[in-house]
Amino acid sequence: MSSQQFPRLGTPSPGLSQPPSQIASSGSAGLINQVATVNDEAGRDADVGTREHVGPSSSLPPREEKQEPVVVRPYPQVQMLPAHHAVASATPVAVTAPPAHLTPAVPLSFSEGLMKPPPKPTMPSRPIAPAPPSTMSLPPKVPGQVTVTMESSIPQASAIPVATISGQQGHPSNLHHIMTTNVQMSIIRSNAPGPPLHIGASHLPRGAAAAAVMSSSKVTTVLRPTSQLPNAATAQPAVQHLIHQPIQSRPPVTTSSTIPPAVVATVSATRAQSPVITTTAAHAADSTLSRPTLSIQHPPSAAISIQRPAQSRDVTTRITLPSHPALGTPKQQLHTMAQKTIFSTGTPVAAATVAPILATNTLPSTTTAGSVSHTQAPTSTIVTMTMPSHSSHATAVTTSNIPVAKVVPQQITHTSPRIQPDYPPERSSLIPISGHRASPNPVAMETRNDNRPSVPVQFQYFLPTYPPSAYPLAAHTYTPITSSVSTIRQYPVSAQAPNSTITAQTGVGVASTVHLNPMQLMTVDASHARHIQGIQPAPISTQGIQPAPIGTSGIQPAPIGTPGIHSAAPINTQGLQPAAMANQQPQPEGKTSAVVLADGATIVANPISNPFSAAPAATTVVQTHSQSASTNTPAQGSSPRPSILRKKPATDGMAVRKTLLPPQPPDVATPRVESSMRSASGSPRPAGAKPKSEVHVSIATPVTVSLETISNQNAEQPTVAVPPTAQQPPPTIPSMIAAASPPSQPAIALSTIPGAVPVTPPITTIAATPTLSAPVGGTPSTVLGPPVPEIKVKEEAEPVDITRPVSTVPPLATNTVSPSLALLASNLSMPPSDLPPGASPRKKPRKQQHVISTEEGDMMETNSTDDEKSAAKSLLVKAEKRKSPPKEYIDEEGVRYVPVRPRPPITLLRHYRNPWKAAYHHFQRYSDVRVKEEKKAMLQEIANQKGVSCRAQGWKVHLCAAQLLQLTNLEHDVYERLTNLQEGIIPKKKAATDDDLHRINELIQGNMQRCKLVMDQISEARDSMLKVLDHKDRVLKLLNKNGTVKKVSKLKRKEKV
């Protein structure tokens, strides 16, 4: 989001100057986003801050975690539109009057219909309206930030509110707040209990990363692909850049939705390309952009292909982002490539890591899908997503358009974590998320950090940074890329990109936590990225990335001077580092930071609240889908089985815990690292350690706490960091890492970064202590308190532990994290069906014994997600159950009211449960079938059967006979009535005279005959049935003779005793 803040113009000064103003505004806002950083942003920030922490403020104190604020970039998103109109509906939209030149940006906040409507009234406040950019020099750009607050209390709705990402402003805060708020995207995972976010719909996701990955497809997320809008601005990923790109070029775009066109337009203009995945609502504004909204609606299917109707370019394949004309700088959106969806429909790709390309600041040129230009060296970032083959899904990824993204050039060394395609397609959909939008900014950031060696990745995505040369450093507002989707649905940009981008950018918070490995957190990545990025810690933890910690981390590894830069000029170096952070968080991906987007569990660390501030973005990817995750590749390093056998939880939990506790920005990633990511680094365990994607890396990167400080505080960051920021974090990380072997890396990274602001806040991302952020200056707020809640850690992962740690993590919050954490903790608590934190993973038989014997229990599919869903639903259900029917009472009029319990319909099939066992009714070998030997019962055995005397009495026969008698009586009544009818009609006129009467007479006659026949046959059947009882006396005599003796004797014995 930050990107918006930075004037696309590339004026670096705004970015730099921003931080101070930002801080100021943040202070006022409490959670103000870093967003202020941008020129617009500054004005906006103040507004937003005031408006609501939710608003742009990054911090968004942990708003109802359930609520998922979605900041929607004004993209045309179909779904969102309606909501937009409703702007008032969900949250007050506070729009500060933007200068005329800006078209008014309207923050749209709407509760998402999808979402539970207003579970969190608070949410409403969250709207983030773009602040007038007046403060910034870039008036043209309209703060297009429309924030849609999705009140989604819906637990499952969209897993991730991707839209949030879109927050057009670049308010990181928006993003953050999204993350923070609820987006909780992080946990959007379906598993997540309903409350968390689930804004859009599914479970995953939602969260900063939401955009990147809607965790669930349920919600229809609309990815707003950039439409082909001519303007570059539009091209820009709207989400990120709205502000970023001055709207100037298309200031007034009207949005189709109610929202003031300006805003929308802004957004759209700004970012045409990046798709926003809105969780559900798309900004109407967007639509006004030309860009069609992309709907990444069904994750299941094409995995995200993001379809952007408007764009002719490879629709899903890639998005080309034109540079934003508005910006002075020619930032080309590299998005084009980014747009690709990574996954094919079905396959979820584990997050691919994206390595930021370290393009130099050169102007980015747009790249075609096929290749990425390096022109924009610094500016653009190439994100490499590598989809490791490891996951089978990876392939899918490839299939997706992602190819376009492939850019080999990228320096980044990212290895992408293996993509765990385990996630169902649904998940993958998310991935597409418009990472692009993040992309653009990120690139810039990245460039700043730039050049980290990149690990080879399979896919490289080019993430353009929007602000290429113009304001390379500052310009980057956010790095959109975070792939948080646990599913990896990462968009090229989104998922992995985030890593790279983020890492590149200031650590943008790439928190994409991809769940690649179910178990592993990519935590490491984040921290690495951070280092590399120099970015503070964008925790990139993407699980997915994990495999190559570097992958995501890849970027990280190369701390790239960023850290130095960081500390020195947070903005500069970070160039936005802070912003980046924020970006990171917001990252166009829409998931700020790491949403994990994994299906539902994304934690979206909405890292950094302010895009600009140096503060680290917290990204926390933490949660991974437990289910998905687990499925997903076991770990990079290890085979799935080891992960199953390994008792990962302890370490994971610990690592996470540690991480959380120590607030060190790097740690964020680090913590993750601890989890699995690290594994990439080298810890063997992580990789295989947990099959479940546990990733509760819950920590997001440090929150952006530093944001405030970022400007000069980088080194100081500690403030933000809370405990010793820079310095401490490294240690922390180490400790975290301790769990995972990779620690060294993260630690190093951290240490490297220390200076960098980002590093500092170790925010526990998950914990996302909004509080913290608030204090911090609002930017941190984004820290994602909400995400925290989202963060649901896999049980296996020992989510609880993690959670706990998170709670502890307050450091994150710097000071007040704890509340947030507490939420987080509660959220973290394991997903349903997860084992208790301490428990070791379920051990599965090594060999399938018998087809049938090993089948799942009745009515459960092996891959059934019922358990997960039940958790989310359970909360709702419980609430409803609490409203138990009132007891019997008599009202004033003497009417007696008796509670009626709905009883299940009576059906013969009630006791017939057909297990979902494919082999249940089929036999493959003769030995599967045994003829049951009939043994003749002895009279004595029969006599001793329970209730035999009752049966002998023939009560069933009598009952049946009585019913047959009733049938004959009914038939007799009908016969009588037909007779009367016939006599009444026919005699008056001769039947032969009228054809109609004749026909009626024949029909009556026929019915009378049928009645007679039925009566006769039923009576006959009844009589013959009762003959069975003719022998009753003899039978009873025999039974009493043979069976009674023993029974009587036994009873007598008992009586005697």
UniProtKB/Swiss-Prot annotation:
Keywords: Acetylation, Isopeptide bond, Methylation, Nucleus, Phosphoprotein, Repressor, Transcription, Transcription regulation, Ubl conjugation. Residues 14-28, 620-641 have a biased composition (Polar residues). The keyword Plastid does not apply. Residues 845-1057 are annotated as: Interactions with SIN3A and HDAC1. Acetylated. Sumoylated with SUMO1. The modification Phosphoserine is found at residues 416, 439, 864, 884. There is a cross-link at residues 794, 873, 878 (Glycyl lysine isopeptide (Lys-Gly) (interchain with G-Cter in SUMO2)). It comes from the Eukaryota. Residues 41-54 have a biased composition (Basic and acidic residues). Residues 1-69, 619-695, 718-740, 827-873 are annotated as: Disordered. It holds the Pfam family SAP130_C. The modification Omega-N-methylarginine is found at residue 206. This is Histone deacetylase complex subunit SAP130. It comes from Mus musculus (Mouse).
